[in-house]
Amino acid sequence: MNFTKRPFLLTILDGWGYSPEVEGNAIHAANTPNLDDLLETYPNTLLSASGEDVGLPEGQMGNSEVGHLNIGAGRVVYQDLTRINRDIGNGDFFKNPVLKQAIENAKAQGSALHLMGLFSYGGVHSHMKHLRALIEFAKDEGITEIFIHAFLDGRDVSPRAALEDMKEHVEYCNNLSVGKIATVSGRYYAMDRDNRWDRTEDAYNAITRGDGVYYSKGPVDAISEGYGRGENDEFIKPTVIVDENGRPIGRMNENDTVIFFNFRPDRARQLTYAFVNDEFDNFERKSHPKVHFVCMTEYDEKLEVPIAFPSEELKNTLGEVLSKEGIKQLRIAETEKYAHVTFFFNGGVEKQNEGEERCLIPSPKVATYDLKPEMSAYEVTEELIERIGSGKYDVIVLNLANMDMVGHSGIMEAAVKAVEVVDDCVGKIITAIKEVGGEAMVMADHGNAEKMVEFCNNTERQCYTAHTSNPVRCIYVTQEKRVELQKGRLSDVAPTILKIMGIEKPPEMTGVPLIKNT
């Protein structure tokens, strides 16, 4: 290794997508003197961050998990969504031994099968196609009592997409003569990932005890009533569906079988722990039925549960290669994106590499981040600048979460503020890097804040809260002259960093360095 311009800082600005559209573009509307200066001064390009270029189905928008996996792996990582879709298509899904055993357990016990997960076509955490494949699998195996616990989205799809989706799904189940929605909860409650256990508790109680915040005679009514309270899909309070006598139609009992069909781990962990961890103490479980619990993918290596689609091992990720070279690394982010710069960036491996330090800055405890668009960016920046000055690290991986997390609110003014906060922080961080003679790459993992509105029927304007499939910026902050970057995809970033540092790219990395040969 002949790299002397240390540290090298990889700055991932979550949700910093590129779009020429002006209307509803918080990035265009914001005052960003620092990012503008970097784009004018240093080599930069656009990277594909969605669809087949990141291992997703064609046209599927990217997300933080997928983005960090591809960036850290230096190759296109075929995602769980793609794998599961493939198995449904070729029939292997219906032979999956873990899923088959779960269904056999329900048959043997004469008990109910509960399917819980994000009720969404978004394809980020789950997909309706997978839920329906499970229903059809169970029906074909003779299961008649199937209850669905629907977690409503409103972030990776339109804020109120669930109502029409639910109407369609109820008709689908009626046609099959099997499958009933037992509970409805916004993902804000059922899929919290920031240790706000009171939210998880509300969802857990609805699912296990039939103890809801609200009760409704049907799932379509439950959603409509939530809208009447001013709640979008994401925030609909846990609602239990009851029969004509007011009794929960799908309360969970001993020996029932549960399949959690989310394939993305980070927002599935807390609720799973509440179900399967005997030592659980984050809230009092008033009911804890012993069930046969199956996870669609591996949510956490500490969870001892059957996994339908185990992780595929990724060898020689960027962090692993740097570790073998004796390079000291720092990973730093606030809570919302900490798992992304550690677990996901390392190829879905929780264990730290040798020589890798981690720094977690707590995210603010607010209901939604539009209430505090700066989140903890300034605290992250202050800590990072101090660590840059220490001279201890060779490579630093940073995530600033604001443009993504505030972008999900759909509130334009808050998103503009988030962009401006990030710009301010980037300016301070790049100044600190230059002062010690380091270099940096400033990029994103997927788009979000560049699209805050959409138009229905070409006329009706509404908030847009999902990610986008737009390309993302990539800037190489260097004093080297005559450097040019070519267009590429996220998986080209790790090979580029290795080339900059004079380290040979391992054969597993199929990405191509972005630096043009001059």
From Swiss-Prot:
User: Which Gene Ontology terms describe the biological processes this protein takes part in?
Assistant: glucose catabolic process; glycolytic process
Q: Can the keyword Metal-binding be found in this entry's annotation? A: yes
Q: Where does Mn(2+) 1 bind?
A: D404, H408, H467
Functional pathway: Carbohydrate degradation; glycolysis; pyruvate from D-glyceraldehyde 3-phosphate: step 3/5
Note whether Membrane occurs among the keywords.
no
Which Pfam families does the record associate with it?
iPGM_N, Metalloenzyme
A Gene Ontology molecular function term for this protein is: manganese ion binding
UniProt binding sites for substrate: H125, R155, D156, R187, R193, R264, P265, D266, R267, K337
Q: What cellular component terms from Gene Ontology apply here?
A: cytoplasm
Active site (record annotation)? S64 (phosphoserine intermediate)
Q: Which domain of life is it from?
A: Archaea
* Catalytically driven reaction(s): (2R)-2-phosphoglycerate = (2R)-3-phosphoglycerate
User: EC number(s) per UniProt?
Assistant: 5.4.2.12
Which HAMAP family does this entry report, sorted A to Z? Answer: GpmI (MF_01038)
Q: What is this protein called?
A: 2,3-bisphosphoglycerate-independent phosphoglycerate mutase
The organism is Methanococcoides burtonii (strain DSM 6242 / NBRC 107633 / OCM 468 / ACE-M)
From the broadest rank down, the organism's phylogenetic lineage runs: Archaea, Methanobacteriati, Methanobacteriota, Stenosarchaea group, Methanomicrobia
User: Which gene is annotated as encoding this protein in its UniProt record?
Assistant: gpmI
